A protein has these predicted regions:
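Gly/Ser/Thr-rich phosphate-binding loop
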Residues: 17, 22-26, 38-128, 140, ...
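Small/polar loops that bind or transfer phosphate-bearing groups
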Residues: 1, 27, 58, 163
Length: 208
């Protein structure tokens, strides 16, 4: 199906997944919202999502509420929330930096909103919910204080830097932008994240 066909009738996406075995698909966050809101039970007649291998969410910030609504909407059609994989990628890194491994539902943790505004991501019983993108598996990733340019300790907020064979060398005919973003052999993403001691990270904000 084409992007236009999906926008015209978002149910087509789930219909295709439900009519084939071993489905694997990826889409941005807004597509999950559209599919959940505009797919009727009648659209899913005879569909079975029990054999879906993975549904990756990327290309824009993954919203915990969207993932929850999507999982609940299609649970009656045997969709397991463990196949939903929040993913973090960059065009500059050939789209892929990290994704949550399959086998468990996406992890959503509340963080103290006041502490987040101070540059500290501290877990709390209530607060701003952030979703885990898993552990980075791009060739090389650092979480760095953008001012000191030193790696931050677990639990602190820093900018994600990456480098490797999958990372481009710069922007075509844009020397100023290239000089700003590609420094010291690393691509500076502009995304601020919090990394757990186990290596899993949560996107907090944008620096640029």
């Amino acid at each position: 199906t084409s992007p236009v066909a999906f926008l015209t009738k978002p149910a087509r996406w789930m219909q295709l997944l439900g009519s084939h075995r071993w489905g694997l698909t990826a889409a941005p966050n807004f597509a999950f919202d559209l599919a959940a809101a505009r797919t009727a039970d009648a659209d899913m007649a005879g569909a079975d999502l029990g054999n879906v291998l993975a549904i990756m969410s990327g290309a824009e910030r993954v919203q915990p509420g969207t993932v929850d609504r999507f999982a609940k909407r299609f649970a009656p059609f045997n969709l397991s929330d463990s196949v939903i994989r929040p993913s973090y990628g960059l065009a500059e890194a050939t789209l892929y930096v990290a994704t949550r491994l399959p086998g468990a539902a996406p992890t959503v943790i509340p963080f103290d909103a006041e502490k987040l505004s101070q540059g500290v991501a501290e877990r709390g019983s209530v607060g701003t919910p952030l979703i885990s993108y898993g552990a980075p598996t791009s060739p090389a990733v650092r979480i760095v204080d953008p001012e000191s340019r030193r790696e931050v300790a677990a639990g602190r907020i820093g900018e994600i830097w990456t480098r490797g064979d999958n990372v481009c060398r710069g922007y075509w005919n844009k020397p100023d932008e290239t000089a700003e973003a590609f420094r010291g052999g690393w691509f500076h993403s502009g995304d601020l994240v919090r990394e757990d001691p186990d290596g899993f990270f949560y996107v907090v904000d944008r620096k640029k």
